[in-house]
From Swiss-Prot:
GO annotation, biological process: translation
Protein name, as recorded: Large ribosomal subunit protein bL25
GO molecular function terms attached to this record: 5S rRNA binding; structural constituent of ribosome
Key words of the record: Ribonucleoprotein, Ribosomal protein, RNA-binding, rRNA-binding
Keyword Metal-binding annotated: no
Organism (species): Campylobacter jejuni subsp. jejuni serotype O:23/36 (strain 81-176)
Quaternary state and interactors: Part of the 50S ribosomal subunit; part of the 5S rRNA/L5/L18/L25 subcomplex. Contacts the 5S rRNA. Binds to the 5S rRNA independently of L5 and L18.
A Gene Ontology term for the protein's cellular component: cytosolic large ribosomal subunit
Keyword Ribonucleoprotein: yes
Pfam families: Ribosomal_L25p, Ribosomal_TL5_C
Taxonomic classification: Bacteria, Pseudomonadati, Campylobacterota, Epsilonproteobacteria, Campylobacterales
Classification via InterPro entries: Rbsml_bL25/Gln-tRNA_synth_N, Ribosomal_bL25/Gln-tRNA_synth, Ribosomal_bL25_b-dom, Ribosomal_bL25_C, Ribosomal_bL25_long, Ribosomal_L25_dom, Ribosomal_uL5_bac-type
Amino acid sequence: MLEGIVRESIGRKAAKALKRDGYLIANIYGKGLENINAAFKVNEFIKEVRKKTTLIFDVKVGSQTLSVVVVDYQKDSVTAELKHVDLKVAQKGVISKYMVPVKITGTAIGLKNKGVLIQSKRRLKVKCAAENLPNFFELDVSKLDVGDALLVRDIVVPAGVTMIDADRVAVVGVEKAR
């Protein structure tokens, strides 16, 4: 389990000092909950996020243990180091919006016919309770030829999950190479 500290002061000076000591600044929030200003060791946070198998993972901040989902993060444009992360508390029974990653499987027929596979959406926006949250959407592209595309409406959505993205939006397609 990832362990962090509660930040007492939330000013720029305090945040810089924490970053200098190897901490990642984080905000944790949820529906009906008070925001928590926290900090995690950067290396520990990266290890935890890489080894997790679900979108939801547990963190311990101070005396609280919370189940959270990564909502957003900021990276340094030059060094690509993590600067800041926003975490949302995944509360059971509370319907909330999440971003779910898209995994592509198979090799498209169109790639052999001088086509290029283009993934226009890497994450899809859904609305559901935390217990119904899928870890990813898996799309099989093996039947796609040049000019074909898989749309949001082609994705099989589990019970209790509602797609927020428009039905006609292309997720992945094969286009003719130039």
